[in-house]
Amino acid sequence: MVNKNAIILAAGKGTRMKSKLYKVLHEVCGRPMVDHVLTEVEKTEPATVVTIVGHGAEKVKDYLGDRSQYALQAEQLGTGHAVLQAEDLLKDQDGITIVVSGDTPLLTAGTFEKLFAYHHDKGAKATILTATAPDPTGYGRIIRNDIGIVEKIVEQKDTNDKEAAVNEINTGVYCFDNKTLFQALHEVTNENAQGEYYLTDVVEILKKKGEIVAAYKMPNFEESMGVNDRVALSQATKVMRQRINTAHMRNGVTLIDPESTYIEVGVKIGNDTIIEPNVVLKGNTTIGSDCFVGAGSTIIDSTIEDNIQITSSTIESAIMHTGSNIGPNSHLRPNAEIGVDVHVGNFCEVKNAKIGDRTKIGHLSYVGDATLGTDINVGCGVVFVNYDGVAKHHANVGSHVFIGSNSNIVAPVEIADHTFIAAGSTITDDVPEKAMAIARARQTNKENYWAKLPVAKDEEWQ
């Protein structure tokens, strides 16, 4: 088996992005562009991956960690100069090396493997990945001779009129014989319009030495898209979204309107789940089978088990167990855990709380920093009062408890099993098992008081 290495070019400043964020760290469907590239490269099982970093180097290293080795390009002197920075890490290795830009998030491992195979079949020292561009402006052109052999690559600013009319472009991905690559790089000069050391000049150097230079034309130009500004970022995101959504539908998920459904890379969805329009699924989210996610819902970094109904609600870093349901217009905040067959109705919020099986929280309630047992009824307008202005406090509620509407549960407090909280109560003390707690002022009726009220003199109120 041929030894494979990879060099990822990630040193560009990305000035056209007009951003404080390092270009290759801009996200496409939830992951930085350079992560997409590295993930696909890793699928080809390279022996060594070297990422060339420059501006914002530490942020790239922090994100990718030990998945790659790194070489610093302190000055931006061109792609040839960038690749040369990996020399100390790779120059003595046999085999082949792929060079790919860190801002091409749509490239796939399948394309890389086809490039490797073509390179091997042609016995080439260098193979260029090319594509036919509808509009080649801005790309380096592939110049072939009369019998179709690659002669050179000409950068946009160095083209003449005839060369500029060529629509076969250089995608910026190459496969080289590793040792040949670094030998040739030392012969590259910066005698061009940009005053830079072009990696593309290696092609001409090898041709002059009589080496075989091949070009594999990929069938899908869209896959080669490089991202240099926010417009291209949105275009790449659109393509990636379509890939992701298509994969889920082929795996048995119903997307009512794929065009309006945003699902990030890494989200897992079981079969026979239905996703309505304008749903957003992000981060490390898993959704089971036979679920329903209603229009306008957002789920982030959460686990949704089987047979769950979510109606127009937001769920963040939470867990919903089998058979539960939520919404419309409710919010599970971080560390909320909803038990089996639990009902969380409309306009409710649950935060840092565990809700036991079969408990019902019907509407207009807040449950924060609490543990609730099983088979509880939480009435309308119940508030778990968890913050004293300085610190958060926890409330524990047992099982088989009835909490009447408009009650306040002031933590820290313990409410035992089989208890009843009367409507309108403000509970500040522990409630023992099988007790009923009433904590409100006694009602007073004042006879004939109506006549003393100002409205009594208004004819409309007579």
From Swiss-Prot:
Self-association and partners: Homotrimer.
Enzyme Commission identifier(s): 2.7.7.23, 2.3.1.157
Gene Ontology molecular function terms on file: glucosamine-1-phosphate N-acetyltransferase activity; magnesium ion binding; UDP-N-acetylglucosamine diphosphorylase activity
Cofactor(s) essential for the protein: Mg(2+)
GO biological process terms held by the UniProt record: cell morphogenesis; cell wall organization; lipid A biosynthetic process; peptidoglycan biosynthetic process; regulation of cell shape; UDP-N-acetylglucosamine biosynthetic process
Protein family membership: In the N-terminal section; belongs to the N-acetylglucosamine-1-phosphate uridyltransferase family.
Residues the record lists as binding acetyl-CoA: N386, Y387, S405, A423, R440
CDD domains: GT2_GlmU_N_bac (cd02540), LbH_GlmU_C (cd03353)
Keywords: Acyltransferase, Cell shape, Cell wall biogenesis/degradation, Cytoplasm, Magnesium, Metal-binding, Multifunctional enzyme, Nucleotidyltransferase, Peptidoglycan synthesis, Repeat, Transferase
Subcellular localization, as worded in the UniProt entry: Cytoplasm
Pathway it works in: Nucleotide-sugar biosynthesis; UDP-N-acetyl-alpha-D-glucosamine biosynthesis; N-acetyl-alpha-D-glucosamine 1-phosphate from alpha-D-glucosamine 6-phosphate (route II): step 2/2; Nucleotide-sugar biosynthesis; UDP-N-acetyl-alpha-D-glucosamine biosynthesis; UDP-N-acetyl-alpha-D-glucosamine from N-acetyl-alpha-D-glucosamine 1-phosphate: step 1/1; Bacterial outer membrane biogenesis; LPS lipid A biosynthesis
Protein known as: Bifunctional protein GlmU
List of residues binding Mg(2+): D103, N228
Organism, scientific name: Latilactobacillus sakei subsp. sakei (strain 23K) (Lactobacillus sakei subsp. sakei)
HAMAP family linked to this entry: GlmU
Reaction(s) the record says it catalyses: alpha-D-glucosamine 1-phosphate + acetyl-CoA = N-acetyl-alpha-D-glucosamine 1-phosphate + CoA + H(+); N-acetyl-alpha-D-glucosamine 1-phosphate + UTP + H(+) = UDP-N-acetyl-alpha-D-glucosamine + diphosphate
One cellular component term from this protein's GO annotations in UniProt: cytoplasm
Primary role: Catalyzes the last two sequential reactions in the de novo biosynthetic pathway for UDP-N-acetylglucosamine (UDP-GlcNAc). The C-terminal domain catalyzes the transfer of acetyl group from acetyl coenzyme A to glucosamine-1-phosphate (GlcN-1-P) to produce N-acetylglucosamine-1-phosphate (GlcNAc-1-P), which is converted into UDP-GlcNAc by the transfer of uridine 5-monophosphate (from uridine 5-triphosphate), a reaction catalyzed by the N-terminal domain.
Start and end residues of each stretch annotated as Pyrophosphorylase: 1-230
